[in-house]
Design a protein with these regions (language model features):
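Glycine-rich phosphate-binding loop at the start of an alpha helix
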Residues: 86-89, 93, 116, 172, ...
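Hydrophobic/aromatic residues within transmembrane alpha-helices
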Residues: 16, 53, 66, 121-122, ...
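Glycine-rich beta-to-alpha active-site loop
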Residues: 99-143, 166, 170-171, 175, ...
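Conserved CoA-thioester-binding segment of acyl-CoA-metabolizing enzymes
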Residues: 1-54, 97
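Short, flexible helix-coil linker/hinge segments at the edges of structured domains or between repeats
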Residues: 81-84, 129-133, 137-158, 199
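Contiguous mid-protein beta-loop-alpha structural module that forms a pocket-lining wall or clamp
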Residues: 150-210
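Amphipathic alpha-helical blocks and their helix-capping loop/short-beta junctions
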Residues: 183, 189-273
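Glycine- (often His-adjacent) and acidic-residue-rich active-site loop
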Residues: 55-91, 142-144
Length: 285
C-alpha cells in the first residue's frame, strides 16, 4: 500500500506530495498529523530553505478532507462527540495556522481541484501557484458545515458580496477569477509546473523575493474564458451584499423576475443548503 503523503528533501527543499490521486488527494487525519510533524521539523532545520506542497496526479491538488472516511472512523470510535473528531479538526486548524505563519517560503502548486481542506493546506502559504486546471471552491454548506480551515478568513477579505457568494453557494471559480480576487499569487501553465519545480529545487531559494523571481520567469496571465466574475460580478454583489440570509433570499427572489439565468441558478443552490450552515457562514464573512 502506497503512502498517503510522501515527504522528500532535495537540495534544501522540503517537498510534500499528497498521494491519494484515486481519492482526489483528500486529506485524512494521519496525513494531517504527518504534515504537522514534518513542518515543525523543517521550519527549524538549517538544511531546509523552503517547502513545496503538491498533489499527485494531474487532476487534483486536494479536493478537501475525506469526510466519508472521517465519518466512518468517528462512528467506529463511538459516535459524536469523540476524541477522534475533536482531534482531527484541532490538528487540521493548527496545521492551517502553522502554514500561514511559516517562517520560510511555502510554495503551493495547486494544479487541479483545490477545495475545502485543500484550500487550508495551500492558500495560506507565501506563494500560491495556480494553473488552468485549478478549480477552487469552499463547498462546506452542502454538507451542513461552514467554510473552515481559514477559508472563512480568506473569503472575509474579499468584497462582501463576492465573499458571501463563494461561502454560501460553494461556487467554483478558476485561475482568472482567483487572480482577480488575489487569492493566488501566481499563474503558471500546467505544462510548466514540472519545470517550475525543477527550477526551485535547482536554485533552493531561501527568501520570498528569490522564490518570486523564479516563479515570475515562468508565469503568465490566466485565460479569461472561464471567468464567472467578468459577466456576473455586479449581479452577485447586488444579490449577496447583505447582513442576513433572509435579506439575501429576498433580494434573489426580487431579482429573479429579470430572468438572469446565472443568478437563478445560484438561488436554486442556496435553497438546498442547510439554513444553519448558511447563517453561520455569513456571520463569519
Amino acid at each position: 500500500m502506497s503512502e498517503e503523503v510522501i515527504f522528500t528533501e532535495e537540495n534544501g527543499i522540503g517537498i510534500i506530495t499528497l498521494n491519494r490521486p484515486d481519492r482526489l488527494n483528500a486529506l485524512t487525519y494521519p496525513m494531517v498529523q504527518k504534515i504537522n510533524k514534518y513542518l515543525n521539523s523543517w521550519e527549524i532545520s538549517e538544511h531546509i530553505n523552503c517547502v513545496i506542497i503538491e498533489g499527485a496526479g494531474d487532476k487534483s491538488f486536494c479536493a478537501g478532507g475525506d469526510v466519508i472516511k472521517l465519518r466512518k472512523e468517528v462512528l467506529e470510535d463511538g459516535g459524536p462527540p469523540t476524541n477522534l473528531s475533536q482531534s482531527f479538526f484541532y490538528d487540521e486548524y493548527t496545521l492551517n495556522f502553522k502554514i500561514s505563519n511559516f517562517k520560510k517560503p511555502f510554495i503551493s502548486l495547486i494544479n487541479g481541484y483545490t477545495m475545502g481542506g485543500g484550500v487550508g493546506v495551500s492558500m495560506h502559504g507565501s506563494h500560491v501557484v495556480a494553473s488552468e486546471k485549478t478549480m477552487f471552491a469552499m463547498p462546506e454548506t452542502a454538507i451542513g458545515l461552514f467554510p473552515d480551515v481559514g477559508g472563512g478568513w480568506l473569503l472575509g477579505q474579499l468584497d462582501k458580496g463576492i465573499g458571501a457568494w463563494l461561502s454560501l453557494v460553494g461556487a467554483r471559480i478558476k485561475a482568472y477569477d482567483l487572480m482577480k480576487l488575489k487569492l493566488i499569487t501566481h499563474y503558471v501553465s500546467s505544462s510548466e509546473i514540472g519545470n517550475l519545480k525543477k527550477m526551485l529545487i535547482s536554485s533552493s531559494p531561501s527568501t520570498n523575493d528569490k522564490v518570486d523571481s523564479i516563479i515570475n520567469s515562468l508565469s503568465s496571465n490566466p485565460n479569461s474564458e472561464d471567468s464567472v466574475l467578468i459577466t456576473n460580478e455586479n449581479i452577485i454583489k447586488d444579490a449577496f451584499s447583505f447582513d442576513t440570509i433572509e435579506q439575501i433570499f429576498e433580494k434573489c427572489e426580487s431579482l429573479s423576475i429579470i430572468g438572469n439565468e446565472f443568478l437563478n441558478a445560484q438561488f436554486e443552490e442556496l435553497k438546498h443548503k442547510s439554513p444553519t450552515s448558511l447563517k453561520i457562514s455569513l456571520k463569519q464573512i
